[in-house]
Amino acid sequence: DQPRSRGLGDVYKRQEDIRSKVEDAEAALNLIMALLSDGNWAIGLGISDGEGSTRDASATATKAVGTRAGQVRVIVDRQQATTEAADIAATFALMAHVLHKRTYEGREATSLVRRGMNQNEAAATLGISKQAMSQRLQAAGWPAEQAGWQLALNLITRAAGQGE
């Protein structure tokens, strides 16, 4: 079957395959977090040292595609890769757990602060007190998500050799 072009990816019979080459760890992380939040995507992250061709990077990412929705499989394709792939995948597994336990109210609250609102602005937008906003963020695991996001960013940056 020949794929039909659809902009970001290729669509095959009953299966979507979206591929994106990103130049930095933060862009990759933001994309993965959006897909994890949705919960319906099997995600593959291929990390190379940047010395290979675009085709090699695409092949690495394709090999990394997970088999289950809400899962991130990671392959680090470089000379000195040790446990980096497993560490990154474990970080995403923990963050996915936090994201999937969120209530509607928790998703609403975290979405506003993720977009740059402070807690007071987000509370006003939702029509709740700042104390209620703080409680929603705590119940939603916002501090854990922030810590996990920073950890994932650090690990991906190191694995890509960008922090060296």
Question: Predicted regions: what is each one?
Answer:
Residues 134-135:
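Key DNA-contacting residues within the recognition helix of helix-turn-helix
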Residues 106-113, 122:
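Short alpha-helical "packing" element that flanks the helix-turn-helix/winged-helix DNA-binding module
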Residues 23-98:
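Compact structured core domains
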Residues 141-156:
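Short, Lys/Arg-enriched C-terminal cap helix and immediately downstream tail that follows
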Residues 119-126:
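Short alpha-helical "recognition helix" segments of helix-turn-helix
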Residues 2-12:
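Single conserved hydrophobic/aromatic residue that forms the stacking wall/gate
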Residues 84-107, 153-161:
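Short, Lys/Arg-enriched anionic-surface-contact patches
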